[in-house]
Amino acid sequence: MEIFGIPSQALFGQLLIGLINGSFYALLSLGLAVIFGLLNIINFTHGAQYMLGAFVAWLGLNKLGMNYWLALLVTPVVVGATGVVIERTMLKQLYKLDHLYGLLLTFGLALIIQGIFRNEFGSSGMPYAVPEVFQGAFNTGFMFLPKYRAWVIVASLVICLSTWYVIERTKLGAYLRAATENPNLVQAFGINVPRMITLTYGFGVGLAALAGVMAAPIYQVNPTMGADLIIVVFAVVVIGGMGSIMGAIVTGFGLGLIEGLTKVFYPEASNVVIFVIMTLVLLLKPAGLFGTQK
């Protein structure tokens, strides 16, 4: 069976790859959007923190016998804690300065982290086994859907929507937004604003680490796994709107699908299609599809 002259199995296979990539685009851009939207910091360390998540899971499995499910719980906390240290010791000095200072600092930190892991582990990838419960695939009738990839898509969607709900629809989210816009007023109500800011950054970093754990069984774990991805994720955030939570989610999944379809119909453009879209969006709507002009 063919669709638009393309074998249906090839088309749906690329759509699946697009959804998988979109799941990671959404998770990572969500973390970036949370950090920028609430803290006004462009966190270029995000790709390295994604890599850290994959490595903590891999080291936990090989050195401590930590299974996948425990890694899903422990890794975001461990890597998020490193984010808390970074925020308290470095980033808090930059909140009132231009975005460029935060960008340069986090870019430098990313290079340091990546360099340390490359020196220790080399550049070759290391496998992380798919959990036994997710081995095998579902036969949908027109394609085989690997169970683990189905889990990643569903879990990413649930995590993204849950984060959006907490930030946009709960009292905690209202406090977070208010602390960004008027910290003195929020502090007057007895809320520890510096602690909220620190935990928010730690949460955003934890999302990157969680994405790293989920990516480990799909992509090989290596020190450069976040280096190229972070450029794409920044483009996703810009297209969706800097600081827009829903923009990060919708744009992440949407661009993953567009990228997958491009590989079917015009493979040569698949590596640049997201950046072409970013250029068009910046020309037509500089604040992003879901962003608001300030």
PLM features: residue spans?
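Membrane-interfacial amphipathic/re-entrant helices at transmembrane-helix boundaries
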Residues: 1-28, 56, 64-71, 98-101, ...
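Transmembrane helix-bundle core of multi-pass membrane transporters
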Residues: 93-169, 196-199, 261, 268, ...
